[in-house]
From Swiss-Prot:
This is DNA ligase. It comes from the Bacteria. One of its GO terms (biological process) is DNA replication. HAMAP family: DNA_ligase_A.
């Protein structure tokens, strides 16, 4: 990743778009597909890079910034549940300095003179849930989703052993929140069952828990060894407790499972001592944890601190460092992606790291192999932090044997044997044979049917491979005639290995359902290099309809300077992406495919919908010293109510809140005739909204 200190504004603008797109993709894979694409450490690095860029260039913060989002949007196969109180995720800290900064921010925000107790508890590596009780009866269970809308998993949550369906002495309305997980031993047994049944094994306990809870058939969930802890409250008709430690005691009294491992810390030293204790003893716990959660214990102080876009100010998660292991590198294989990029993959002597058997690891690119001097036959260090494919972090040179061999990048594509070329600026090797390369064609079809694209359920990796091998499909367009082809065939798909009448029927129904597709999904499904979900949405907002999109692409292909400049001015669409778009539309097969698809699909025009509130768009300015509020708390309250807080007064300002020694801003507000109030009036205004 680039050095943030040296990056200029233009580079930052492009990088923020790229990060938003990449993080959105990783969020969807983690929260919705339950199949993380990168390690926790790599994700955290990307997220923190995004935060640092936003801190340096606050005027470049995007509407779809990852720092404003929680989780990922829910799928259509479950009913949607709106969270009355948003289910936010936690910010992360990674060392003692970060923790001290977190504690200092609390003292500064609340203007505290002394340490306020912090409740510390293990961060369970599972799936977050919310359960609502009305008059003591469980009525709704939901996933976090995007933090505002989750999936209805009521039927599934009721199958969990000892999860209360009814609670006594409960308030009229109570929403509890917690984590659903699978213990390590149960996870091992579950994977053994999966293997015996010829099914794919789960990558880790978190994925197993999430996949189990998101089953359409609750009887499948009932067979899975799910457990839960509750640790927070979403909403309630009456106050249950005044602090986190009191709340857990109340939950236990009501019959919920709570994690008994928790500590009320009265100093920094006690916080760090508890963290070290859990880090050392995590291997002895029956379940996976990936850090320690710190919460301001006093609920009244929590309320004052409030939230930022995606997380509470009063809590954070102190993550454990990644788990390291060592094993032998047996060979290096090469994978060809949908855009022709070749990725080296390490094939390893199987090793258990953190309860998961690892036999493959990513090597990223060929420059990375050379930089780390990784050789076949070496003993390599692996880093795993909850990911599917861990990373190789280095080589144990002391164990290097004389016959360890260097790996030379291939000159020809392993799939189609065409000559490869090196792209220096991207540090990659690429096959440019496009759809004539079997590997690229396969990956392109896989991308086309994926959840974020056309979302055709029932066409997974194995099914796509099978249909291509049997000659039933050779490109995305063929998918929409699969039913007709099957009806005309003497050998029916439902009679072939791995298929059945029901699965084929469901597949055809899902294909039919996918024919109604939004324009951004369609653009993303095309698989244009560097055009991810966010950039597809940018293009959609610009063009509005499929017809206009195609017309503008034709002009772009003809090097129309006006359309080129228009697109180049869009945040995140730079010269490099425009070249990729032009290259894509220069390929005759791509144009034919798009034309054919447009004849069988209903590509919906773009419609922008935004929720409005009474304060949406109001611009307020705080100036001077407030008697009771810190500037941070005042700003947070305003933003929570939908206002935009500006640093200076202008003719666009709607309201100025003036404290002592207000100075030039107050003077300018008076000159412009802008409404001015003091802190007391502001607090009254806030209370009455």
């Amino acid at each position: 990743m680039q050095n943030i200190e040296k990056i200029n504004e233009e580079e930052a603008k492009k990088l923020l778009i790229e990060l938003a797109d990449k993080i959105a993709q990783y969020n969807h894979a983690y929260y919705i597909e339950d199949k993380p694409l990168v390690s926790d450490a790599e994700y955290d690095q990307l997220f923190n890079t995004n935060l640092k860029l936003e801190q340096k260039f606050p005027h470049l913060i995007l509407e779809n910034s990852p720092s404003k989002k929680i989780g990922a949007k829910v799928e259509n196969k479950f009913a949607k549940v709106t969270h009355q109180v948003p289910m936010l995720s936690l910010s992360n800290v990674f060392d003692e300095e970060d923790v001290k900064d977190f504690l200092d921010r609390i003292k500064s925000f609340l203007r505290l003179d002394q340490f306020s107790p912090i409740f510390c508890e293990p961060k369970i590596d599972g799936l977050s849930f919310a359960a609502t009780y009305k008059n003591g009866i469980l009525t709704t269970g939901a996933t976090r989703g995007d933090g505002y809308i989750g999936e209805d998993i009521t039927a599934n949550i009721k199958t969990i052993k000892d999860f209360p369906h009814k609670i006594n002495n409960a308030p009229e309305l109570l929403e509890v929140r917690g984590e659903i997980y699978i213990e390590k031993n149960d996870f091992t047994s579950l994977n053994q069952e999966q293997e015996q049944q010829g099914k794919d094994k789960f990558a880790n306990p978190r994925n197993a828990a999430a996949g189990s809870l998101r089953q359409l058939d609750p009887s499948v969930t009932a067979k899975r060894p799910l457990k839960y802890f509750v640790y927070a409250i979403g909403s309630a008709k009456e106050e249950l407790a005044n602090s986190q430690d009191q709340l857990l005691a109340k939950f236990k009294e009501l019959g919920f499972n709570v994690n008994e491992i928790g500590k009320l810390a009265n100093s920094e030293e006690e916080i760090f001592s508890f963290y070290e204790y859990l880090k050392t003893n995590r291997k002895n716990l029956p379940y996976e944890i990936d850090g320690v959660v710190y919460k301001l214990n006093d609920f009244a102080l929590q309320d004052r601190m409030g939230f930022i876009a995606r997380s509470p100010r009063f809590a954070t998660a102190h993550k454990f460092p990644a788990i390291i292991g060592q094993t032998k590198l047996l060979s290096i294989t090469v994978q060809v992606g949908r855009t022709g990029t070749l990725t080296p993959v390490a094939e390893l002597e199987p090793i258990e790291i953190g309860g998961v058997i690892v036999s493959r690891a990513t090597l990223h690119n060929y420059q990375e192999i050379a930089r780390k001097d990784v050789r076949v036959g070496d003993y390599v260090f692996l880093q795993r932090a909850g990911d599917v494919i861990p990373q190789i972090t280095g080589v144990d040179l002391a164990k290097r044997s004389a016959d360890a061999t260097t790996f030379d990048p291939p000159l020809f594509c392993p799939s189609c044997n065409s000559k490869l070329h090196y792209v220096p600026e991207d540090i990659i090797i690429r096959c440019d044979n496009g759809l004539n390369c079997p590997a690229q064609n396969y990956e392109r079809i896989r991308h086309f049917v994926s959840k974020n694209a056309m979302d055709i359920e029932g066409l997974g990796r194995k099914q796509v491979e099978f249909l291509i091998d049997k000659g039933l499909i050779s490109n995305p367009y063929d998918i929409f005639f699969l039913k007709e082809k099957n009806e005309a065939s003497l050998t029916k798909l439902e009679n072939m290995d791995g298929w059945g009448k029901k699965s084929v029927e469901n597949l055809f129904n899902n294909i039919e359902k996918s024919k109604n597709v939004s324009l951004p999904r369609f653009i993303y499904a095309l698989g244009i290099r560097h055009i991810g979900e966010q950039n597809a949405k940018l293009l959609t907002r610009e063009f509005g309809s499929y017809e206009n999109f195609i017309a503008q692409m034709e002009l772009l292909k003809e090097n129309d300077p006006e359309i080129y400049q228009k697109l180049n001015n869009l945040d995140g669409i730079g010269d490099k992406m425009l070249v990729d778009i032009i290259d894509f539309f220069d390929v005759k097969e791509n144009i034919e495919l798009i034309k054919n698809l447009s004849e069988v699909l209903n590509i919906e025009d773009y419609k922008e919908t935004r929720e409005q509130s009474s304060l949406t768009g109001k611009i307020v300015v705080f100036t001077g010293s407030m008697p009771t509020l810190s500037r941070a708390e005042a700003k947070a309250t305003a933003e929570k109510l939908g206002a935009k807080v500006a640093a200076s007064v202008s003719s666009n300002t709607d309201l100025v809140i003036a404290g002592e020694d207000a100075g030039s801003k107050l003077k300018k507000a008076k000159e412009l005739g802008i409404k001015i109030i003091d802190e007391a009036e502001w607090l009254t205004l806030v209370r009455d909204i």
